[in-house]
């Protein structure tokens, strides 16, 4: 389970303070990167991006994420997510909205991780995406999760 963000002010302070320490100690907030794990072992690194978020493959964030994956021997991905029905660019998601996910492999480990589509532009359903998350862990999605996602 993911935890709710509880430390925005602390993190904003540290981010600003780090800039004061000089150009020769660069650091960055890696946005919304999750370590997908199973039994305390990392399975993949995923940077989740909203459908309106910018993806720049030459950015320091993406290049660093790719390098982290390579160094750890883990697949690294960008997963863009969106909804079929949303109120404005960053607005509330409508209750009848259908979520979609786009899985973009970043390194060689990711290209061999059983991505549900060979087309980086393909949008997959939430069920397909969550099934893939279970498969990354060598597991089968439980039927109760399938039933909940099919409602």
Cite the ranges covered by each PLM segment.
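Conserved catalytic cores of phosphodiester-cleaving nucleases, focusing on short active-site segments
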Residues: 32-34, 40-52
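Nucleic-acid nuclease catalytic cores
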Residues: 69-103
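Active-site metal-binding core of divalent-cation-utilizing nuclease and nuclease-like domains
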Residues: 1-39
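Active-site-adjacent loop/helix micro-motif of nuclease/hydrolase catalytic cores
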Residues: 25, 52-62
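Helix-rich interaction surfaces within compact, conserved domain-sized segments
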Residues: 94-151
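Residue-level recognition of conserved beta-strand positions in structured domain cores
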Residues: 47-50, 59, 80
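Short connector loops at helix/strand junctions that flank enzyme active sites
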Residues: 27-29, 41-43, 60, 71-73
